[in-house]
Amino acid sequence: MAQMNFGGVVETVVTSKEFSLEKAREVLKNETIAILGYGIQGPGQAGNLRDNGFNVIVGQRPGKTYDKAVADGWVPGKTLFSVEEAAEKGTIICMLLSDAGQIAVWPKIKQYLTPGKTLYYSHGFAINWNDRTGVVPPADVD
């Protein structure tokens, strides 16, 4: 592990020496990683995971960004779904929608966050200000 300084905060960071790509593939081999949103962060994160051998699907509403996902090789009905369907199919749910998008889709996807699934955010306005947004994950979701 390494000690790294992030803006004056020193954190211990796990490196590839302790947790290799091969180990990550083994640990996640039975998981479906659902990337919700294909705007700013989605293409990079989804493509990186896919290119490194992980089972990845994308959830995106129809429109220009959906068309971009198709152009990038995501296949409708196979690796590209509606946001709701991707949330249902995924075991690891990556919330990459805009803050406003997260708030808008939350009522539609929370039913798919079932026990044992993992939910993560790359930016967290909606979850950090849940008293204002209503985005409150179930207690049995990691």
Give the ranges of each region predicted by the language model.
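N-terminal Rossmann-like NAD(P) cofactor-binding module of classical short-chain dehydrogenase/reductase
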Residues: 93-94, 120
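Glycine/threonine-rich flexible loop motifs
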Residues: 101-108
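Conserved acidic residues
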Residues: 90-91, 117
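Helix-to-beta-strand junctions that scaffold the AdoMet/dcAdoMet cofactor pocket
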Residues: 113-114
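Glycine-rich, N-terminal phosphate-binding loop of Rossmann-like dinucleotide-binding domains
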Residues: 96-98, 123
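NAD(P)+-binding Rossmann beta1-loop-alpha1 motif at the extreme N-terminus of oxidoreductases
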Residues: 2-75
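Short acidic low-complexity segments
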Residues: 74-90
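Rossmann-fold NAD(P)-binding glycine/threonine-rich loop
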Residues: 118-142
